[in-house]
Amino acid sequence: MKKIKCALIGPGNIGTDLLAKLQRSAVLEPVWMVGIDPESDGLKRAREMGIKTTSDGVDGLIPHMKADGVQIVFDATSAYVHAENSRKVNEQGALMIDLTPAAIGPFCVPPVNLKAHVGSGEMNVNMVTCGGQATIPMVAAVSRVQPVAYGEIVATVSSRSVGPGTRKNIDEFTRTTAGAVEKVGGARKGKAIIVINPAEPPLMMRDTVHCLTETEPDQAAITASVHAMLAEVQKYVPGYRLVNGPVFDGNRVSVFLEVEGLGDYLPKYAGNLDIMTAAAARTAEMFAEEILKGELVLQPTAVAA
């Protein structure tokens, strides 16, 4: 079966984990890994796998995109450089999947709104953040039952799983995640908190979701909705688990989650990498299937859609 060729920008924790997942895909074929440090572990690993690499940043990739047939590019760098990366990639007629909190394109949280992106012709979609991918499905599970006045999420991740790019983007992480809690999760007001835990041995990713419903919560309907959403997320992140909840206290609905990774790059405690990279791969596969069917024709654009 024909596969759609992909490039990855950013050979850090997220990019390296994503590369492992793309290599198992039936419709995606990673052919380039782009970095800025020739000595980086991620570039070395990619080279060993037979992937083409450049340490000249996105400018080292652009001249080769057409010849190598690259149609989908993943950006796992930093929010600060994403807009420029996206502009250059879109000009080449390739779709950009943004794993930074830049959020210049529409948010995509697969179990909630992936189908809404089908046929919309976007050239840039944003995967929110790892905390967003873990928690927004649960906010949406409550808000599809009844209106949510306020949604608050707390993502706790191990220090070892948080690379320099993510650390530089903490403010963007909280802003972007809070925005997506509203736009995708359906809460009228959203708030996001990230906790980076330095404990050794490293702790598994844990997430807490609190929703305040406008009226008294329909406990049976919300519980059923949460369990249905849990099953949807587990289709692409098998280590996504409901630890407790939904717990009801007045109008507050609380859900407690943990996310175990597949251990593709970092060990299984780094579920935050897995949920982000699995969601990005799932999204890219949907676009790739559309391209292969001839239903999506990518057009060069001057700016991201």
Swiss-Prot record:
One GO-annotated biological process of the protein: catabolic process
Catalytic activity entry: acetaldehyde + NAD(+) + CoA = acetyl-CoA + NADH + H(+)
InterPro entries linked to this entry: Acetaldehyde_dehydrogenase, Acetylaldehyde_DH_C, NAD(P)-bd_dom_sf, Semialdehyde_DH_NAD-bd
Entry keywords, A to Z: Aromatic hydrocarbons catabolism, NAD, Oxidoreductase
EC number(s) recorded for this UniProt protein: 1.2.1.10
Residues that, per the record, bind NAD(+): 161-169, 272
Stretch forming the signal peptide: none
An example Gene Ontology molecular-function term: acetaldehyde dehydrogenase (acetylating) activity
Active site (UniProt): 130 (acyl-thioester intermediate)
Full protein name: Acetaldehyde dehydrogenase
